[in-house]
Amino acid sequence: MSGPLEGADGGGDPRPGEPFCPGGVPSPGAPQHRPCPGPSLADDTDANSNGSSGNESNGPESRGASQRSSHSSSSGNGKDSALLETTESSKSTNSQSPSPPSSSIAYSLLSASSEQDNPSTSGCSSEQSARARTQKELMTALRELKLRLPPERRGKGRSGTLATLQYALACVKQVQANQEYYQQWSLEEGEPCAMDMSTYTLEELEHITSEYTLRNQDTFSVAVSFLTGRIVYISEQAGVLLRCKRDVFRGARFSELLAPQDVGVFYGSTTPSRLPTWGTGTSAGSGLKDFTQEKSVFCRIRGGPDRDPGPRYQPFRLTPYVTKIRVSDGAPAQPCCLLIAERIHSGYEAPRIPPDKRIFTTRHTPSCLFQDVDERAAPLLGYLPQDLLGAPVLLFLHPEDRPLMLAIHKKILQLAGQPFDHSPIRFCARNGEYVTMDTSWAGFVHPWSRKVAFVLGRHKVRTAPLNEDVFTPPAPSPAPSLDSDIQELSEQIHRLLLQPVHSSSPTGLCGVGPLMSPGPLHSPGSSSDSNGGDAEGPGPPAPVTFQQICKDVHLVKHQGQQLFIESRAKPPPRPRLLATGTFKAKVLPCQSPNPELEVAPVPDQASLALAPEEPERKETSGCSYQQINCLDSILRYLESCNIPSTTKRKCASSSSYTASSASDDDKQRAGPVPVGAKKDPSSAMLSGEGATPRKEPVVGGTLSPLALANKAESVVSVTSQCSFSSTIVHVGDKKPPESDIIMMEDLPGLAPGPAPSPAPSPTVAPDPTPDAYRPVGLTKAVLSLHTQKEEQAFLNRFRDLGRLRGLDTSSVAPSAPGCHHGPIPPGRRHHCRSKAKRSRHHHHQTPRPETPCYVSHPSPVPSSGPWPPPPATTPFPAMVQPYPLPVFSPRGGPQPLPPAPTSVSPATFPSPLVTPMVALVLPNYLFPTPPSYPYGVSQAPVEGPPTPASHSPSPSLPPPPLSPPHRPDSPLFNSRCSSPLQLNLLQLEESPRTEGGAAAGGPGSSAGPLPPSEETAEPEARLVEVTESSNQDALSGSSDLLELLLQEDSRSGTGSAASGSLGSGLGSGSGSGSHEGGSTSASITRSSQSSHTSKYFGSIDSSEAEAGAARARTEPGDQVIKCVLQDPIWLLMANADQRVMMTYQVPSRDAASVLKQDRERLRAMQKQQPRFSEDQRRELGAVHSWVRKGQLPRALDVTACVDCGSSVQDPGHSDDPLFSELDGLGLEPMEEGGGEGGGCGVGGGGGDGGEEAQTQIGAKGSSSQDSAMEEEEQGGGSSSPALPAEENSTS
């Protein structure tokens, strides 16, 4: 045995003395004393009694003997007599007789020591007899020590006595190191975990644990004191399993029963502050529940009868808990570690593990060292997990199979980590025999370095060893050493894996990272494939988007993992379908004039979202272990997010939506609580009038223009987006993926096509060939490509930020006839494939057909046509009727609008679909009773229909029926981003909305004078915008539907900021009760009907640009709120009128109490705060000078003032008591920006270009947000006070 004790690896600090750890292979055959602690040894000191028995096979006993010999050389006569008794018992056990010293040196040494130990005054004869007796005992002990010396420590030419004494000294050091573990335990006694524990007596503890142990005869329980490390309780089964009497364990140190290589693992896994508390329930069921939830540790425990020549270690699975035990009635309760120990049997002996379940996994580094071993390997190989960690993989393989590892790693590199099966290999079990295993391998490609970070192996035992007891110690043999061929092969593999991965093959889900050159056609469409994709190319797109990932995650969560795997096995057929799709049974029956829509349709793209029960999709899948494992990790992360359970359930239902999934409970939720997670049935009506058979393009990859009904699948983005906020953990940007935005917001009339299409039929994206479609779902490549593309998209967004910010509505080209009306709607930019491409649409707009062109436009004014039908005639029960409110001029009277064209569709003002959020809606008695005729937006007379340059009416839209405007329910929620930490990222994307600023219908959008060229066309243009926006939202693809829902969230203006001051559609003035602003026009329709960006889930496309538009169109005299409808709630509140804020009472939070709670949490976490050791600090300080100063690097330590955006340090931060207290806690100064100023967001700075623009992305977002707020305050014209920045961030 050689080498230091690795106990510190399991946890805890390094020990001062170099503790010794024997090797893993005992040397049988050496005589050894009894393994169990006996009464004869109990009188010895704690350090020397049985402390050595915490070592492996032959080591523990030799250690104990060496301690006794060394102790006797420095102790008095009493110790000599005790040593004599022990030696006599050892002689009787080992049948050995004393012999004279082996050398004169040893003899003189022993003589000198005995003279010092036993000064005698009773005469020469008594002195000589005592000396002879001492020499005799010392030589006996030395001989016993030599017999226990491991073979590897016996070297030729070395003194056996010296080697024996050195070995004994090392054993003593280990015992002392073991004792320091207990001191560590006692120091952590005051941890909070030890405060709330139930106290048990020994009788109560035995009663509770007996229900455990009686269920499994291979299980016993033991309680170890954290203060002394001694056993205070052990169950009856321990004596049977360890073949010792129960009394033998009373008062013994538990670590002395463990194999030495397991001591460190045991202490590292039983830190008191990290252990669960033993439940208070007395039933075995409750205990079992806790038992299955906690992490176990594997250790070998010594056992065997006294007559055995040496100790035998048996493997156990220990599950630790912390509790308090009162040993006696008068004694105080002491914290103890309660261990439930279950013996591990060989998987090949009865009860055997079934052959099909003899599977385990491993993970090793590029240098072929085990990094992780599945605990299922223990009964199959005989090794405990800690035996293999850090050991070379090649050392355990058969010599003939070692060269195969080089070929395996080459294939891993070629396949970029893609899982693959390989021929069987032979693995050496602990008993020395080989196990034949079928193997599968995969690699994890680091997403940034593109190198293989580690290799995963999945192994299934094919042939069991001849000796089925894999825990049998191997035959005595020299300690295995690393052969030169093993070292050389490991170096070759390591050099091989240093190469970056270059492959176009799809990568594995479990992080087998992004590819260097993903194919444009066959690469799984990541969330940002659209960034560089050619939107105008009709080539076959990639088969899946990030939206599909979210849907698949919900399928797994709600349908079951196996069903999900089977559902992905076979691609559904590529069908052609009528626009109605599978939803004809539920599709707006009152709005379906075309009988062709009633034909049974072929399953469309929505079949991807159907439940996996479809028989054509059932097929076993080749999902690998890491794919399922990563899926499980994503699901666990989703469950940790604060998504309402109703929303999650809606997500599941929309993922597998069929005609029958509009369940009754969904219908019940219609009304004040809008249900937005439902599949939009009106999406089936997208091409209702011209029921032309259409092909469905596959979403993802390079998205071709999506038209009309091709969004059936993307309806799931209504709910799959709720999982995006959790899946963004894979990327750094707090926004939904670009392709998701495109899917949700794509409009057939605005997407640039390959060429102008004047055909009268609805424009359809060309159908890719069925061969190009391959259902991928949640695969490795989707997340990896998503990560890769998001990086580039994030940088591109900043590169184009200045140019997009400079765009003005005046520079927007007139829209094509029949599609674009009035100012360029924000919906246009939704078809761009990236932020960079969005500006192109201002310069070249593709003419679209004049036939039904359902384009999503802003709706700054309500439709001039009659209001929607009453609830009884509502085509879809889950749809919420909009709140019809008149818009009053400054003189207070409602203004009529010119009559709408006779071709206006019945769905002029359709009901919005919204996600299930609670909305507070004020009744309409706050306003004058509206007349039955439509309300107008301006008093300017309208002279005839608008010119074709502004728009061309859609002739296929008949007027809707009249209905009283009394629906009082409107979706009011603004959960666009719940955390102020995402404020700067939320504002980063606001600028691209510049082109939609004029049509945004802001609080005072129509108050200012319009350009003369637009004076006549403005009212009618707005009317048609309302009509087409409404029809588009009701009838177009589900991405526009989702856009409606999500934009409604963030654009509800004061409706959201004021918690429902008369509906999300209310304009600023009307929402606050100020009716003088005729400019409020129809922000009802605008905010509740035609929002086209997914703000609800973190995408922020528009508040900055809209702020400029609102400022330009607002007159100072108007009484409006200085905010833009798209702004987040904290920005709305900062600029809201006080009267509005009275209807939105934000819970008051005392800053002092909040800071006090934070300080208490910081104090509780202080002991767990990671700290660098002095050596680490010196080492880091030699490389980074800022480490020595305890500050951040200058490149990161950039702060900005919340008022001016400058780079000046915020002075208010230095005097803050919280920061001074943080310094007292010894925490690292990891401030991210402008202190408590609040407005600086995450980055906190205002970096202005160069390299800081890349490193301070968050700072840019913060400065853009500050500038947006500043612009609004200057141009809003309202005198309403703004809330402090601190209140903004707090709320």
Swiss-Prot record:
Question: Which branch of life, at top level?
Answer: Eukaryota
Kindly list the places in or outside the cell where this protein is found, as annotated in its UniProt entry.
Answer: Nucleus; Cytoplasm
Which residue windows does the record flag with biased composition (Pro residues)? 751-769, 859-873, 955-965
Record region (Disordered): 1-134, 508-544, 647-698, 749-772, 809-873, 938-1037, 1051-1099, 1207-1291
Motif LXXLL, chain ranges? 1042-1046
Tell me how the protein is altered or processed after translation: Phosphorylated on serine residues by CSNK1D, CSNK1E and probably also by CSNK1G2. Phosphorylation by CSNK1D or CSNK1E promotes nuclear location of PER proteins as well as ubiquitination and subsequent degradation. May be dephosphorylated by PP1.
Keyword Cytoplasm in the entry? The reply is yes
One family name in Pfam for this protein = PAS_3
Q: Which UniProt keywords apply?
A: Biological rhythms, Cytoplasm, Nucleus, Phosphoprotein, Repeat, Transcription, Transcription regulation, Ubl conjugation
**What is known about its induction?**
In the suprachiasmatic nucleus (SCN), behaves like a day-type oscillator, with maximum expression during the light period. Oscillations are maintained under constant darkness and are responsive to changes of the light/dark cycles. There is a 4 hour time delay between PER1 and PER2 oscillations. The expression rhythms appear to originate from retina. In liver, peak levels at CT9. In the SCN, levels increase by light exposure during subjective night. Circadian oscillations also observed in skeletal muscle, bladder, lumbar spinal cord and liver but not in testis.
List every position bearing Phosphothreonine: 121
Q: Which GO terms describe its biological process?
A: chromatin remodeling; circadian regulation of gene expression; circadian rhythm; entrainment of circadian clock by photoperiod; negative regulation of canonical NF-kappaB signal transduction; negative regulation of DNA-templated transcription; negative regulation of JNK cascade; negative regulation of nuclear receptor-mediated glucocorticoid signaling pathway
Q: What is the effect of changing residue 663 to A?
A: Reduced phosphorylation. No nuclear entry PER1, CRY1 nor CKSN1E
Q: Where is the composition biased (Low complexity)?
A: 48-115, 513-533, 652-662, 1051-1061, 1077-1094
Q: Where is this motif: Nuclear export signal 1?
A: 138-147
The protein here is known as Period circadian protein homolog 1
